[in-house]
Amino acid sequence: MPAVKIIMSTETSASETTPLRRSENETPDHKELAQSNSNSRQTTVNSNNNNYSNSVQVRLQEQDRDSDSEQQQHTATITMDTNKRILCRVGLDVLILLCAGFPILLFFLLGEPYKRGFFCDDESLKHPFHDSTVRNWMLYFIGAVIPVGVIFIVEVIISQNKAKQDNGNATSRRYVFMNYELPDWMIECYKKIGIYAFGAVLSQLTTDIAKYSIGRLRPHFIAVCQPQMADGSTCDDAINAGKYIQEFTCKGVGSSARMLKEMRLSFPSGHSSFTFFAMVYLALYLQARMTWRGSKLLRHLLQFLFIMVAWYTALSRVSDYKHHWSDVLAGSLIGSISALVVANYVSDLFQKPNTKPYLARTVQDMNASPAQAITITTN
């Protein structure tokens, strides 16, 4: 019996060491298991985070592309609107200028001056015919080439001086049309020359209306017309002395049809009105725009020379027997008053600085808020 007990005890002892029960050396470490599980969960989380991050980046890139596309479309739309606005403004200016100048062409081609009578013994109508001292090409040079050239030179110099002062960073010099940045001098020349041309056309139209409405005879009327009365008599016959002659025809030997028409257009003087408008306006322009620290007298000398050009032109019309002195005076007043009105009330030469831009600027300026908008001062 005791032996049996020993055997059973041995079996029991052996059963405790069977492979079905792991020994302490073979038991896994709980820390390693926890670490492994933690690493597995971390890998899963990192994978999920990477997938989410990639998804967010893709969405952001798509949003950026959409935003860039919308911005480009918006920019293109604003650019097209800006170009259209500039074209409409320029086209409207040209149309208005043509409308104002068209009646002058009609007067020249189709206009008929008022038929005024005369006295055969009127000494003011018996002067000989002379060619003009100031020819037409000289008149056009005085009234067109000189003002345009002076305005161009002054505006270019002003623009260069501004560029030097601003070191190329001046925002007021940015004008964009058809994706081309227009310089400031070009815009200013367009404004100044356009307004000058508008004023010159109106001054000439005012003069022509008076010419064709009054029909005053020129001092060389008798020499050019060589009038013959209905009964065949002339001014050399005594029966016509002291008579006011209304019914007559012009023999006009050696006179062209244009000369026979021009002999009735004495009042007011067109040469005087045109040159005085051009030179007075140019003097006012220099007063407002020309600033040279070298010598203040240079500006006033140029102004004096320009006025003297107009003064000489007006005097030559009397000495050439093209006009009576009152015709020249009236023409000079029309031109001078027109220049004063245009310079002070039509142009911006003497206006206070204005913060409203004349032309549309860049796309950034179009999108800028009122507080951030770039303003331009015109002077």
Curated annotation (Swiss-Prot):
The chain crosses the membrane at residues 90-110, 138-158, 266-286, 330-350. It catalyses: a 1,2-diacyl-sn-glycero-3-phosphate + H2O = a 1,2-diacyl-sn-glycerol + phosphate. InterPro entries: P_Acid_Pase_2/haloperoxi_sf, P_Acid_Pase_2/haloperoxidase, PA_PP_rel. Glycans are attached at N51, N169. Expressed in embryonic gut in a pattern that guides germ cells towards mesoderm (initially in hindgut and then on lower side of gut). During extended germ band stage, expressed in ectoderm as a medial band throughout the trunk. It is a multi-pass membrane protein. GO terms for molecular function: phosphatase activity; phosphatidate phosphatase activity. Residues 1-53 are annotated as: Disordered. One of its GO terms (biological process) is germ cell repulsion. Residues 35-53 have a biased composition (Low complexity). Keywords: Developmental protein, Glycoprotein, Hydrolase, Membrane, Transmembrane, Transmembrane helix. Residues 19-33 have a biased composition (Basic and acidic residues). One of its GO terms (cellular component) is apical part of cell. It holds the Pfam family PAP2. Its EC number is 3.1.3.4. It is an enzyme of class 3 (hydrolase). Homodimer. This complex seems not to be involved in substrate recognition, it may confer only structural or functional stability. Responsible for guiding the germ cells early in the process of migration from the lumen of the developing gut towards the overlying mesoderm, where the germ cells enter the gonads. May be involved in lipid metabolism. This is Putative phosphatidate phosphatase.
